[in-house]
Amino acid sequence: MSTAVTEGIEVTVRSTFRPERSEPGRFLFSYTVRIANQGEVPAQLVSRRWIILDANGEREEVVGDGVVGQQPHLEPGEHFEYTSFCVLKTPHGSMRGTYRMVRDGGQAFDATIAPFPLVVPGTLN
């Protein structure tokens, strides 16, 4: 699990290996993200940027609008949660990134997604 807070936006991520959807050389992980506005000003998530690393050092960058087809607007005290997935060629790796947030007044900032592990149980000591 990882947690980061940027300008009142808390991002928490938990990942899980999905053996039923994996096979040798293709390891599927789901991750659940909770984005909470702990600040005093509304903010909208408009885009995402993920950096995905596998155990071989291969790096993939994923950039796009919103998350799971949405651009959630969070009032103070509100949160948004979603689950997505990632496929690696190796049994472990990591993800990290940022969400581009925009305040109602137009101020934009990047909310940090702290690095979190993607690990098949029993593969690391």
Curated annotation (Swiss-Prot):
PROSITE patterns the UniProt entry points to: APAG (PS51087)
Record's superkingdom? Bacteria
- Outline the extent of the ApaG domain: 3-125
Give each disulfide bond as a residue pair: none
**Which Pfam family, any one, appears in the UniProt record?**
DUF525
Question: Which InterPro entries does this entry report, sorted A to Z?
Answer: ApaG-like (IPR050718), ApaG_domain (IPR007474), ApaG_sf (IPR036767), Uncharacterised_ApaG (IPR023065)
What organism is recorded for this protein?
Answer: Anaeromyxobacter sp. (strain K)
Q: Indicate what this protein is called per its UniProt record.
A: Protein ApaG
